[in-house]
UniProtKB/Swiss-Prot annotation:
CDD domains tied to this protein: OAT_like (cd00610)
Residues bearing PTM N6-(pyridoxal phosphate)lysine: 287
Identification of the protein by name: Hypotaurine/taurine--pyruvate aminotransferase
UniProt-listed PANTHER family: AMINOTRANSFERASE, AMINOTRANSFERASE CLASS-III
Keyword Transferase included in the entry's annotation: yes
Catalytic activity: hypotaurine + pyruvate = 2-sulfinoacetaldehyde + L-alanine; taurine + pyruvate = sulfoacetaldehyde + L-alanine
Family stated for the protein in its record: Belongs to the class-III pyridoxal-phosphate-dependent aminotransferase family.
Transmembrane segments: none
Biological role stated in the UniProt entry: Converts hypotaurine to alanine and sulfinoacetaldehyde, which desulfinates spontaneously to acetaldehyde and sulfite. Can also catalyze the degradation of taurine into alanine and sulfoacetaldehyde, which is stable. Has 2-fold higher aminotransferase activity with hypotaurine as the substrate.
Inducing stimuli: Induced by growth on hypotaurine.
Pathway noted in the entry: Organosulfur degradation
Recorded superkingdom: Bacteria
Annotated source species: Paracoccus denitrificans (strain Pd 1222)
Pfam families: Aminotran_3
């Protein structure tokens, strides 16, 4: 098939998109009167659309994914070379890039030993849920089957992962959901539920209260984001994670850390949990693993977890009876190997720390200038600014005005994000997650655009 792509006329591409593509998270009624945006090319942190307009991308592909930036020829070359050698074999066997990336990944994750490949963050998390249920059936007599999740966290788009969605608007109309998934309170100190000095410990103690209410012998695992993403860019309060770890050990509850957003450098360490001294049983990751150059996700476990599935070889049902077809595609791990090399060789973890500090400093300066900013939060290049109608009452800013800020930044040529269709009444946080290659000039342009937008929208 020959594609007629005239670089000077992309109207037929836009027409094909409008006629046939069902876009994610989009109300298509708007496309009866306006064209959908079609991106054509990317380089570094810059994007160009079908009209030729240039944008600075402050959200790494819209969903915190393109960690090393666009246009990485070395990743594309590595994928091409691998695909002509061996493109695929099912995950029941091994491949060279699968083995090599697993080894390199585990070297970055002390205490973890095994890597299970699949395609998306939703899948990676669902694998854990299945593992927890199988462990409950084989090792706990069917008990310890419940999985706890946190208000405001998000873990995926399948029915089971939506059952653990702490973002209610993501789950509306997709139920009923399966049993055994139980919510625990959020840990956003800006909107704290208890007027105490040691809020972090109190928020963690609330998890223990849920465990005791449900019965410790029924709870098998808890899934948590190290830094909550779409629920408002929530960094954990002091003392929170240490207490969570203690509670998990006290009640023999497996700790599942969802690194789908934070993983591979986003917070300034290889993984977000490493910022807080956590020792997890499961770690899941996707987005930044290959920076969007190939589809890959990983479910990483300890040897203790792995051994629970090989202790009875005479039982033909004892192993993990799961498969993910495209978890066997070699493009994922070979892209991930090169992605990891780039992060190391270019010092992107250190850059993330430095540019993250600059981003937070700039946002805090904007908070001094604009009273609509109620709180600034973040870790590394993963930052948010919560907009409020009134600082004293912390009344959330109207969602339409928050989206007007996003739209004005877009009009200036800067793509930022905001919590969207997640939390009823609380979709009021601007979200920034630029590529780990961001420069000081990039950061300043992003925050200057926000400054201009806030001035215009709230004049």
């Amino acid at each position: 098939m020959t594609l007629d792509l005239n670089p000077n006329d992309m109207s037929h591409v836009v027409a094909a998109d409008r006629a046939h593509v069902w876009h994610h998270l989009s109300q298509h009624k708007q496309y009866e009167t306006i064209d959908p945006r079609v991106f054509v090319e990317g380089k570094g942190m810059r994007l160009w659309d079908a009209t030729g307009r240039e944008f600075l991308d402050a959200v790494s592909g819209g969903v915190w994914t393109v960690n090393v930036g666009y246009g990485r020829e070395s990743i594309a070359d590595a994928i091409r070379d691998q695909l002509v050698k061996l493109n695929y074999y099912a995950g029941a066997a091994g491949t060279v890039p699968g083995a090599i990336f697993a080894q390199k990944l585990i070297e970055k994750m002390p205490g973890m030993t095994r890597v299970y490949y699949s395609n998306s963050g939703s899948e990676a998390n669902e694998k854990v849920y299945k593992m927890v249920r199988q462990i409950a059936a084989r090792h706990h007599g069917g008990k310890k089957w419940k999985i706890l999740y946190r208000d405001r966290d998000y873990h995926g788009t399948t029915i089971a992962t939506l059952a653990t969605s702490g973002q209610d608007q993501r789950a509306i109309a997709y139920g009923p959901f399966p049993d055994g998934f139980v919510r625990v309170p959020h840990c956003l100190e800006y909107r704290k539920q208890w007027d105490v000095e040691n809020y972090g410990e109190r928020a963690a103690d609330a998890i223990e209260e849920v465990i005791l209410r449900e019965g410790p012998d029924t709870v098998g695992a808890i899934v948590l984001e190290p830094v909550t993403a779409g629920g408002g860019v929530i960094t954990p309060p002091e003392g929170y994670w240490q207490r969570v770890q203690e509670i998990c050990r006290k009640y023999d509850i497996l700790l599942h850390i969802d690194e789908v957003v934070c993983g591979l450098g986003r917070t300034g360490t290889w993984f977000g949990y490493q910022q807080y001294g956590i020792e997890p049983d499961f770690v899941t990751m996707a987005k930044g693993v290959a920076s969007g150059y190939a589809a890959i996700s990983c479910t990483v476990t300890t040897e203790r977890v792995f051994e629970m599935f090989k202790d009875a070889p005479e039982d033909g049902m004892s192993f993990f009876r799961d498969i993910s077809t495209f978890g066997g595609c070699t493009s994922g791990p070979v892209a991930a190997i090169e992605n990891m090399r780039i992060i190391e060789d270019e010092g992107l973890l250190d850059n993330t720390v430095a540019m993250g500090e600059r981003t937070l400093a700039n946002l805090n300066a904007l908070m001094e200038k604009h009273k609509v900013i109620g709180d600034v939060r973040g870790k590394g290049l993963f930052c948010g600014a919560e907009l409020v109608a009134d600082r004293a009452s912390k009344e959330p800013m109207d969602e339409k005005k928050v989206q007007a800020v996003v739209a004005d930044c877009l009009a200036q040529g800067v793509i930022i994000g905001a919590t969207n269709r997640s939390l009823p009444g609380f979709n009021n946080t601007l979200c920034l997650s630029p590529a780990l290659i961001a420069t000081a000039d990039n950061i300043d342009r992003i925050t200057d655009a926000i400054d201009n937008a806030l001035t215009k929208v709230f004049a």
